[in-house]
A protein has these predicted regions:
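C-terminal soluble interaction/assembly domains
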Residues: 216-284
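Bacterial N-terminal signal peptides
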Residues: 7-15
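Positively charged n-region of N-terminal signal peptides that target proteins for export
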Residues: 1-4
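Acidic/His-rich structured neighborhood in mature extracellular/periplasmic domains
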Residues: 62-196, 240, 249-252
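Beta-rich nucleic-acid/ligand-interaction surfaces
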Residues: 114-118, 207-213
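Short alpha-helix capping/helix-loop boundary micro-motifs
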Residues: 200-211, 225
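Sec/Tat signal peptide C-region and signal peptidase I cleavage site
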Residues: 16-20
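Cationic-aromatic interfacial patches
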Residues: 21-93
């Protein structure tokens, strides 16, 4: 794919804009390119592993990476690539895109960019703020349609979830791209209505201990929210250490990517804003 590379100096360092057909302009720095190459080199010997094992290998490369919220909230809307700092969903998305790219015969940063766009934006097309998949449930649906993974919550022992979607459209002041844009709010409301028409499952906190045996290392764990109208409160990558099930995540309390020091069941029992989990299994 032909890309036009434009380099310019900004206050925070070197920024590169890659013009990609159908993807809009990608925003990243030379440090992101260097970090990509470091990770590809580190996991090159593991590229033939099943995806659930490979994504854990990739995730370990980012232990200690600073937690920073809001890195995508720049205007105009462009595909932002940031391997230097992350939040919870971007960490999982980044690890999945990197693991997929590592399996290429010749992994390239351009291929990584394309995969990020396919995961993050509706139909892989950057077309303004509302084209981004803001609700994790839509991210899960699209990733399933594209063959990256399959939700297995029901098969893991889950229960029906009466999930409502309304938080973004009813709290526009919480989002600068919605606060003064009735048109954007209307588009988000349409997304919410579509998501509302689907069926959902979750493993409630009280059932997690019994169902945990069905969760594998490398599964994506999405923590369901107790906030009205909001689907997912947090997300990470499951990790089995002996008989213990924990997870790797970008932690707000630790301010960095960590292997959670307590088991999954113990972690969620102490978080009032989380009602249970959904389980997404990466295709091999």
């Amino acid at each position: 794919m032909k890309r036009t590379i434009i380099l310019f100096i900004a206050l925070f360092g070197l920024v590169i804009s890659a013009s990609a057909t159908g993807k809009g302009d990608a925003r990243f720095t030379q440090r992101d390119v260097d970090r990509f190459n470091e990770v590809m080199s580190a996991v090159s010997a593991d590229r033939d592993l099943p995806m659930d094992e490979l994504i854990v290998k990739v995730a370990r490369q980012f232990l200690g990476t600073p937690y920073v919220a809001g890195t995508l909230e720049q205007e105009p809307e462009r595909l932002t690539v940031n391997l230097r700092e992350t939040d919870c969903i971007l960490f999982v998305e980044m690890c999945l895109a990197l693991a997929l790219t590592a399996k290429d015969d010749e992994p390239s940063f351009n291929s990584y960019i394309d995969r990020l766009a396919t995961l993050r934006y509706r139909d892989g097309v950057v077309d303004g703020y509302t084209s981004r998949l803001h609700y994790t449930s839509e991210w899960i649906v699209q990733g399933g349609v594209n063959g990256f993974f399959k939700e297995v919550t029901k098969e893991c022992g889950g229960s029906p979830l009466a999930q409502k979607f309304s938080f973004m459209s009813t709290h526009p002041s919480s989002y600068k791209q919605l606060s003064n844009s009735p048109a954007n709010v209307s588009k988000i409301r349409s997304v919410e209505q579509d998501l509302q028409s689907r069926s959902y499952w979750y493993i409630p906190k009280a059932s997690l201990a019994a169902c945990a045996k069905n969760i594998r290392s490398g599964d994506i764990i999405a923590f369901t929210s107790t906030v009205a109208g909001l689907d997912i409160a947090h997300i990470g990558i499951a990790l089995r250490q002996g008989d213990t099930l924990t997870f790797i995540h970008a932690s707000t309390s630790a301010d960095k990517v960590i292997i959670n020091p307590t088991p999954l069941t113990q972690y969620i029992s102490g978080v009032k804003s989380q009602s249970g989990v959904r389980v997404i299994r990466i295709n091999k």
